[in-house]
Amino acid sequence: MLNIYLKSKIHMATVTGKKLFYEGSIEIDEELMERAGISEGEMVLVVNVNNAERFVTYVIKGKRGSREINLNGAAARLAEEGDRVIIMAFTLSETPVKSKTIILNDKNEIVQEK
């Protein structure tokens, strides 16, 4: 039987920008994506720590090294610049999966990897 397991998590990212009139998505610095094991186009669950909003969107690759986390389209209404968010990707598997987590500071620099 297939179960849903956490695969990747970017913990406590800071929202750096918003583009309301865009197709939609969350734009993540390419380096952060790679370190967390998240792919472009992958579906993610985003939790806003500041206001408890939760939403599902897909990832687009941001500029490597920019440390930017940008919300686009309707998702831009669910967080403000400076809000802290948790970004999670999941996978289907018949056996438990060891997830990869990166923890960020308020400048979106990696302070810990698990």
From Swiss-Prot:
Cofactor section: pyruvate
> Taxonomically, which superkingdom?
Bacteria
Record: active site: 25, 58
Q: Could you describe the subunit structure of this protein? A: Heterooctamer of four alpha and four beta subunits.
The record's cofactor note says: Binds 1 pyruvoyl group covalently per subunit.
The Swiss-Prot or TrEMBL record describes its family as follows:
Belongs to the PanD family.
Residue numbers binding substrate: 57, 73-75
- Tell me which GO cellular component terms the UniProt record holds: cytosol
Q: What is its main location?
A: cytoplasm
| Pathway given in the UniProt record | Cofactor biosynthesis; (R)-pantothenate biosynthesis; beta-alanine from L-aspartate: step 1/1
**Which residues does the record list as Pyruvic acid (Ser) (modified residue)?**
25
- Supply the name of the protein: Aspartate 1-decarboxylase
The UniProt entry, under Gene3D superfamilies, shows: 2.40.40.20
Q: Which GO terms describe its biological process?
A: alanine biosynthetic process; pantothenate biosynthetic process
One Pfam family from the UniProt entry? Asp_decarbox
SUPFAM superfamilies found in the cross-reference section: ADC-like (SSF50692)
Provide the catalytic activity annotation.
L-aspartate + H(+) = beta-alanine + CO2
Q: Which organism is it from?
A: Thermotoga sp. (strain RQ2)
Cite the CDD domains for this sequence: Asp_decarbox (cd06919)
Q: What does this protein do?
A: Catalyzes the pyruvoyl-dependent decarboxylation of aspartate to produce beta-alanine.
What HAMAP family does the record tag this protein with?
A: PanD
